Structure formats: structure tokens, C-alpha cells
């Protein structure tokens, strides 16, 4: 069975793919998530989601996962050490360029899977521009943190102050990675 990951395949294997595959393009960010989580938390969460999806649907062959674009647009975190960020214009242009090349190669179905709240609008703009340039392209935008019932599982206090690096993201990260949050900060 072929890998579900584009970057695991050879050029010859990619050339034989059906052009009606759904290409999942993961978007994350490298930024601070408090003193207890790694700067790559957004990517770790997406990797966990994608690996869970693959395990749940191992025989589903309609999709292929593209490499994660892990350096996102996170200017709101630039004052924190460890943040790697592109400015908004360059980031949007980069997305359009990558997906545009795939459209030229006749891929037409995409899922933008995002794990950084600060780039939702960037993906909206990029998707709109791609659809206007390349006809018959379908793009579904999904954000792991915006699902039905989301507000019911997060403590009200956390919703007031934002869940970035909070209990919600910490729980998901620890669950998927089996890493322990830095206990000294959490006073465990």
C-alpha cells in the first residue's frame, strides 16, 4: 500500500497518482505556547490528528497528505523568543504559489487543515484567490479548534482568556505525543 504522505513517495509514484485525489495541506505555526509546551505544539497537534485519521481509515485511498507548512504567519507572537513567522502578504503568496502549482498539474481538490488561529484569515484570502485563478477547484478549510460543541469542553474561564497554550491545547498535545508538559511550571 502506498504511503498516505506525499513526501514519502517517489517522483514516479506521484506521477501515477490519480488527479482526483484529495490533497490535505496542513498549516501550523512555530510559536510560544506558554512555558510548558514546545514551540512546535501546533504541528504536533496536527500530526496527531492526521495519524489518528490514517489509523481510523486505513483503506481510504482518496486522499494524500502534503508536507506541513509549519512556519506560518504568527506576528502576534513575535515578541516571544522562538517564534518563526512570515509576514501576512508573503505567507498568502506562498500558499497561492504552492497550491497554484498543484492546480497546474491538474489537482483540483484540497483540504486546508489549520492549527493556528492567527492565520484563519490568511487561508480564507488564499483560497479565494486560488479559486478565482484556477477554475473548478474545491477547497475545504478546516480548523481543528473550531468544531461543533467546542465551547462545551473548554472551561469557561479559559474561554474568557483564550485557550492558546491553556488546558485545551495542553491536553491535546499531551494526549497525542505522550510528552509531559513541563511540570515545574504547572506545579505538579
PLM-predicted stretches and their roles:
Residues 178, 185-188:
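Single conserved hydrophobic/aromatic residue that forms the stacking wall/gate
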Amino acid at each position: 500500500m502506498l504511503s498516505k504522505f506525499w513526501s514519502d513517495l517517489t517522483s514516479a509514484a506521484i506521477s501515477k497518482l490519480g488527479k482526483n485525489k484529495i490533497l490535505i495541506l496542513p498549516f501550523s505555526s512555530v510559536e510560544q505556547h506558554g512555558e510548558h509546551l514546545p514551540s512546535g505544539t501546533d504541528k504536533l497537534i496536527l500530526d496527531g490528528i492526521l495519524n489518528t485519521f490514517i489509523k481510523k481509515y486505513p483503506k481510504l485511498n482518496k486522499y494524500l497528505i502534503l508536507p506541513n507548512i509549519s512556519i506560518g504567519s504568527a506576528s502576534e507572537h513575535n515578541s516571544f523568543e522562538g517564534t518563526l513567522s512570515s509576514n501576512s502578504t508573503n505567507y498568502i503568496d506562498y500558499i497561492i504559489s504552492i497550491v497554484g502549482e498543484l492546480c497546474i498539474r491538474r489537482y483540483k481538490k484540497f483540504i486546508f487543515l489549520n492549527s493556528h488561529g492567527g492565520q484563519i484569515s490568511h487561508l480564507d484570502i488564499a483560497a479565494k484567490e486560488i479559486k478565482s485563478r484556477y477554475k473548478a477547484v474545491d477547497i475545504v478549510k478546516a480548523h481543528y479548534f473550531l468544531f461543533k460543541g467546542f465551547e462545551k469542553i473548554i472551561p469557561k474561564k479559559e474561554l474568557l482568556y483564550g485557550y492558546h497554550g491553556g488546558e485545551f491545547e495542553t491536553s491535546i498535545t499531551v494526549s497525542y505525543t505522550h510528552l509531559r508538559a513541563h511540570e515545574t511550571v504547572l506545579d505538579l
